[in-house]
C-alpha cells in the first residue's frame, strides 16, 4: 500500500509541475509578444482612457467593495477569496464563484482569454506578480477600469458612463 501511495503522490506532483510549467510558458509567451510596459502604454493611449483622478471616488469604492474588498491589503492574490470560492464550488459541485482579485482580472483582461483552464489561471498568477511589481494599487485599479467589460459593447468606464447615462466622467 505504501508503494501505491508513493506512486499516487509522485503522479500528482508530476502533473502539478507540468501544469505549472505550462502556465509559466503561457505567461512568458504573452510577455514576449508584448512586454507589460508596452501593453500598458497602448492601453493608456486609447481615446476613452480615464485617469484614476477622473473617476469618482464613490465609484472606485463600489468596484473595490464588489470585486475585491481586500484589494489594498494583498499582493495581487487573495488566498482567503480563493479558498472561499473553492469551498463553495465543491459544495455546489460546479464553478459558482470566483476568487480572482482585481489584479488577476486585469491580467486576464489584457493578456489572456476568458476560458476556464487551470493553465490560464497559473499564467495569470505569474502575470499578477509582474503587474504588482511594476505598478501601484491605484495604477492597477485605473488599468482595470479601462480594460473591463461593462456590457453592451462598453470596454472602459468612460464608455460605460457615456453609453448608459449619456454623461461624461
Report residues per predicted region.
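Juxtamembrane regions of bacterial inner-membrane/periplasmic proteins
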Residues: 1-169
Amino acid at each position: 500500500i505504501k508503494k501505491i501511495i508513493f506512486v499516487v503522490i509522485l503522479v500528482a506532483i508530476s502533473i502539478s509541475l507540468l501544469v505549472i510549467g505550462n502556465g509559466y510558458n503561457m505567461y512568458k509567451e504573452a510577455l514576449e509578444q508584448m512586454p507589460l510596459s508596452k501593453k500598458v502604454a497602448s492601453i493608456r493611449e486609447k481615446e476613452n482612457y480615464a485617469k484614476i483622478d477622473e473617476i469618482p471616488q464613490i465609484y472606485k469604492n463600489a468596484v473595490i467593495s464588489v470585486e475585491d474588498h481586500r484589494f489594498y491589503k494583498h499582493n495581487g492574490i487573495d488566498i482567503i477569496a480563493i479558498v472561499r470560492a473553492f469551498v463553495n464550488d465543491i459544495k455546489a459541485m460546479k464553478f459558482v464563484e470566483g476568487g480572482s482579485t482585481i489584479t488577476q482580472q486585469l491580467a486576464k483582461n489584457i493578456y489572456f482569454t476568458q476560458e476556464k483552464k487551470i493553465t490560464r489561471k497559473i499564467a495569470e498568477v505569474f502575470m499578477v506578480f509582474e503587474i504588482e511589481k511594476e505598478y501601484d494599487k491605484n495604477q492597477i485599479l485605473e488599468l482595470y477600469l479601462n480594460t473591463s467589460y461593462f456590457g453592451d459593447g462598453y470596454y472602459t468606464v468612460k464608455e460605460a458612463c457615456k453609453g448608459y447615462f449619456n454623461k461624461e466622467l
